[in-house]
Swiss-Prot record:
Any GO MF annotation of the entry: phosphate:acyl-[acyl carrier protein] acyltransferase activity
Any Pfam family the entry gives: FA_synthesis
Reactions performed catalytically: a fatty acyl-[ACP] + phosphate = an acyl phosphate + holo-[ACP]
Gene source species: Petrotoga mobilis (strain DSM 10674 / SJ95)
Localization terms from the record: Cytoplasm
The protein's name in its UniProt record: Phosphate acyltransferase
Main subcellular location: cytoplasm
């Protein structure tokens, strides 16, 4: 794909619209995108911010989708930035759309406004996790579908494999998250899903994966339902910040040698922080809908917004949606 159009939800996120404006400027300054490739969806903006982005295409959208907006309500808010952005995806006016707004509302807009791809029953949230091997580990579904059937795991695997291609992972290994590795472990849905994936010769299915193996080199794609996946994600996030907090407290309370040791390890500690910092990952893909849809973290700052725009741009150039085999 030669030229692309990437849309950004002006009102999405806790720090919007200022974080979105600054993120757009950050992306332009660092040459992630050109002014011709970036579209701001939403027009209720201060004159000061408007002056900063006057050279960009701005698409009118009046209604704000708040964190309290229910997924069903957004479908009636046809003048909201979220609805307009997903409609532009559907009409091929955008190649990708990024929002840091209400997750449930965005997933609803993606599914019912942009629409599902042919042959996909359940779109899913797909993201890359850090791992011991420094290769990305793909988690799908990370929170879109709390209640699933066994057949939906088949869709999740296809979506994960498409994302693996985007990350240059060849012949990715697919595993199902379970409470044990034995065939008889898990509930009936998980066991039925395992049989479905075993039968599909296109999948490099390696069986069950336990939660303690999340960061090991046991597989490349971890498939699970959205309820479990979202809890995995939030547990990881909470654990990471707890460890960092305890590390800082230990250094603060330690003696001279502890502080000197921390000084020598400063570069390594910074690398560790960057590895678990959501801002460096940009966003989560909602795959299975008609177009590249990226969910940025709700508390995204300008840097995180810029990174989300960058991954959306790369995915659009890669024709990620075309890589989901039907």
């Amino acid at each position: 794909m030669n030229s692309v159009k990437i849309g950004i939800d002006l009102y999405g996120g806790d720090n919007a619209p200022s974080s979105v404006v600054e993120g757009a400027l950050f992306a332009l300054k660092n040459k992630f995108l050109s002014p011709e490739e970036l579209v701001i969806v939403g027009n209720e903006i201060s004159k000061e911010d408007l002056d900063k982005i006057s050279n960009l295409q701005i698409v009118p959208a009046k209604n704000l989708v708040s964190n309290e907006t229910k997924p069903t309500e957004v479908l009636k808010m046809k003048e909201s930035s979220m609805y307009v952005g997903c409609e532009m995806l559907k009409n091929n006016e955008l190649n990708a759309f990024v929002s840091a707004g209400n997750t449930g509302a965005l997933l609803s807009s993606g599914t019912f406004v942009a629409g599902r791809l042919p042959g996909i029953k359940r779109p899913a949230l797909v993201l890359a996790l850090p791992s011991k091997s420094n290769k990305p580990k793909i988690l799908v579904d990370a929170g879109a579908n709390a209640e699933v059937k066994a057949e939906h795991f088949y869709d999740f695997a296809r979506e994960g494999i498409a994302y693996a291609k985007f990350l240059n992972l060849e012949n990715p290994r697919v595993g199902i998250l379970n409470i044990g590795s034995e065939d008889e472990k898990g509930n009936s849905i998980v066991r039925e899903a395992s049989n479905l994936l075993k039968e599909e010769k296109k999948f490099n299915y390696v069986g069950y994966v336990e939660a303690r193996e999340l960061f090991d080199d046991t597989c490349d794609i971890i498939v699970t339902d959205g309820f479990t996946g979202n809890n995995v994600l939030k547990t990881m996030e909470g654990t990471a910040y707890f460890i960092l907090h305890e590390l800082k407290e230990t250094i603060k309370k330690g003696g001279l040698f502890t502080k000197l040791g921390a000084l020598f390890l400063r570069g390594s500690l910074k690398s560790l922080v960057n590895k678990i910092d959501y801002r460096s990952y940009g966003g989560t893909f909602f795959l299975g809908v008609n177009g590249v849809l990226v969910k940025a973290h709700g508390s995204s700052d300008a840097e995180a917004i810029a990174n989300a725009l960058y991954v959306a741009y790369r995915a659009a150039k890669f024709d990620l949606i075309e890589k989901i085999e039907i």
